[in-house]
Amino acid sequence: MSITEYATELKGALRQYPNFPQEGILFEDFLPIFRDPQLFKKLIESFKLHLQEKFTGKKIDYVIGLEARGFLFGPALALALDAGFVPVRKQGKLAGEVVHAVYAKEYGEDVFEIQADSIPEHSNVVIVDDIIATGGSAKAAGDLALQLNANILEFCFVMELDFLKGTQKLQAPSFTLLSGQEEALSK
């Protein structure tokens, strides 16, 4: 199957919730994909095919997953790519020496951390999360990878809120598997 065929099938599994978590957002719940092992495999295979096609001849050393939903598929994707998995967590959740990045949220700031020895310098990394909205958390993960002198090949997302233009903040190109939400819901 092609990535497009996989994406069509995966999109059919999403559940939609208008005006959640706030007015104007159509929340698309991708958790039903994980209830069906065949759909979960297709999700991983879609990202694997995309990355292998785009980065032919280049080894992806690590998949970096953002807390918490990047943890749902990041480790499986890392295994499929024969790469390591490295988590980015909220402040205070990782042991040992960490580096941190601050990012803006709707009502203040938050901090992401990564273990300082988790990625050797010049490693090729891909950063994954379920969705990109404003881009703050993804950019913070990119900042962490760059602090460790990693080479960010790409950011990969299952979904995107295009109208928030979050990908414009990122330090590398991005790929969104399922079509995004191009505009806010009308009120």
Swiss-Prot record:
Pathway: Purine metabolism; AMP biosynthesis via salvage pathway; AMP from adenine: step 1/1. Its cofactor is Mg(2+). Homodimer. It catalyses: AMP + diphosphate = 5-phospho-alpha-D-ribose 1-diphosphate + adenine. It is an enzyme of class 2 (transferase). Belongs to the purine/pyrimidine phosphoribosyltransferase family. AMP binds at residues 133-137. It comes from Kluyveromyces lactis (strain ATCC 8585 / CBS 2359 / DSM 70799 / NBRC 1267 / NRRL Y-1140 / WM37). Catalyzes a salvage reaction resulting in the formation of AMP, that is energically less costly than de novo synthesis. Its main location: cytoplasm. Its EC number is 2.4.2.7. The gene is APT1. GO terms for biological process: adenine salvage; AMP salvage; purine ribonucleoside salvage. SUPFAM superfamilies: PRTase-like (SSF53271). CDD domains: PRTases_typeI. It comes from the Eukaryota. It is found in: Cytoplasm; Nucleus. The keyword Ion transport does not apply. One of its GO terms (molecular function) is metal ion binding. GO terms for cellular component: cytoplasm; nucleus. Pfam families: Pribosyltran (PF00156). Gene3D superfamilies: 3.40.50.2020. Keywords: Cytoplasm, Glycosyltransferase, Magnesium, Metal-binding, Nucleus, Purine salvage, Transferase. This is Adenine phosphoribosyltransferase.
